[in-house]
């Protein structure tokens, strides 16, 4: 099922971009590529696909070379967009050393965000990870106030309070399930440490990327190109430094009986990363980094529920309640942003007079 979805999404992604290229000649694609709701829908679909694909790779074959997997995804992404550019379907700017130097901190933050995310998931259940990920939205929102002149309304603040409350409930449900076992509590707190590190690195990545996009006037494929090109060497270096490349572990990750299948699925997951890379940059560009993060948080709620059902996560009153409180926070925030946009639209004619 995961393979079929990946193939279909890849075909749709290719067809849509080809159609956009044709439409662009007639000036018909601008309304689509600059449409916020369309970018949000595309980001949701691609992020769900990416999560399912990665879970299939790591879960089905007990894969533990995460840095190497991410490096393969980056390499496949680069080859894919280079092929699309060669066919005249997409375009992006040529490599520039000065731009690469300015963009390198973003690539480093991307690697840090991915690594801390994988470490948090190693020690925390999927529902708890998902709920605590919402705290990133608060960091991004106040980062936008400082850097981009954003505004936090009373209703948005209320949604942030609900996010914090959902995290507290999730923590209580997690500790209630763990009990007083010292070893398990130690691993749990270690997971929370990685989770908070991931929240800060994720917020820094999104905010700095948005600021750099404004300064460099990067388009979506420019952002994808530099993110993958600069993160690839970092991922390879970190893989060889921190991951187990012994023959025993290699045989565990690439068993002879399904080695070809494992390699194929790794490449397929890299192809699916093209969609999430493009849609992430697209969503940040045409909406806001806070909206992008909130959409991602809401999009993770179905994954959190699947964690309760399929992944042996703690199922109790508190864990289930935390998911729905987090969802309620997302609804509150969506309504708050909608009201704020309407108010801004009404103020614009007055400001122009």
UniProtKB/Swiss-Prot annotation:
Cross-referenced InterPro entries: TPT_transporter
Signal peptide: none
Gene source species: Meyerozyma guilliermondii (strain ATCC 6260 / CBS 566 / DSM 6381 / JCM 1539 / NBRC 10279 / NRRL Y-324) (Yeast)
Subunit text: Homooligomer.
Membrane topology note: Multi-pass membrane protein
Family indicated by similarity: Belongs to the TPT transporter family. SLC35D subfamily.
The name this protein goes by in its record: GDP-mannose transporter
Membrane topology, Cytoplasmic segments: 1-31, 88-102, 149-154, 209-227, 284-290, 337-353
Membrane topology (Lumenal): 53-66, 123-125, 173-187, 249-262, 314-316
A GO CC term attached to the entry: cytoplasmic vesicle membrane
Localisation: Golgi apparatus membrane; Cytoplasmic vesicle membrane; Endoplasmic reticulum membrane
Keywords per UniProt: Cytoplasmic vesicle, Endoplasmic reticulum, Glycoprotein, Golgi apparatus, Membrane, Sugar transport, Transmembrane, Transmembrane helix, Transport
TM segment ranges: 32-52, 67-87, 103-122, 126-148, 155-172, 188-208, 228-248, 263-283, 291-313, 317-336
Role played: Involved in the import of GDP-mannose from the cytoplasm into the Golgi lumen.
Sites carrying sugar chains: 260
């Amino acid at each position: 099922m995961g393979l079929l979805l990946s193939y279909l999404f890849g075909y749709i992604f290719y067809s849509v971009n080809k159609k956009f290229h044709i439409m662009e000649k007639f000036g018909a694609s601008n309304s689509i590529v600059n449409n916020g709701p369309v970018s949000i829908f595309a980001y949701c679909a691609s992020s769900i696909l990416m999560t399912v694909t990665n879970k299939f790779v790591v879960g089905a074959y007990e894969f533990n070379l995460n840095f190497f997997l991410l490096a393969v995804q980056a390499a496949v992404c680069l080859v894919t967009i280079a092929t699309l550019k060669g066919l005249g379907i997409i375009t992006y700017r040529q490599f520039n050393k000065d731009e690469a130097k300015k963009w390198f901190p973003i690539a480093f933050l991307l690697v840090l965000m991915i690594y801390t995310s994988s470490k948090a998931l190693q020690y925390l259940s999927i529902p708890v990870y998902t709920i605590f990920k919402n705290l990133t939205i608060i960091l991004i929102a106040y980062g936008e106030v400082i850097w981009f002149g954003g505004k936090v309304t009373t209703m948005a603040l209320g949604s942030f309070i609900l996010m914090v409350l959902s995290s507290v409930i999730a923590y209580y449900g997690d500790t209630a399930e763990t009990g007083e076992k010292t070893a398990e509590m130690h691993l749990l707190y270690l997971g929370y440490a990685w989770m908070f590190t991931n929240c800060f690195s994720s917020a820094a990545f999104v905010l700095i990327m948005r600021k750099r996009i404004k300064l460099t006037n990067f388009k979506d494929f420019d952002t994808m190109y530099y993110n993958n090109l600069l993160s690839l060497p970092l991922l390879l270096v970190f893989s060889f430094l921190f991951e187990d490349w012994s023959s025993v572990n290699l045989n565990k990750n690439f068993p002879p009986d399904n080695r070809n299948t494992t390699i194929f699925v790794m490449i397929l997951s890299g192809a699916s990363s093209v969609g999430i890379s493009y849609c992430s940059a697209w969503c940040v560009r045409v909406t806001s980094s806070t909206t992008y993060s909130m959409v991602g948080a809401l999009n993770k709620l179905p994954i959190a529920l699947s964690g309760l059902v399929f992944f042996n996560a703690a199922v109790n009153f508190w864990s289930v309640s935390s998911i729905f409180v987090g969802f309620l926070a997302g609804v509150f925030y969506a309504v708050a942003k909608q009201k704020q946009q309407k108010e801004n639209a009404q103020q614009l004619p007055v400001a122009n007079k």
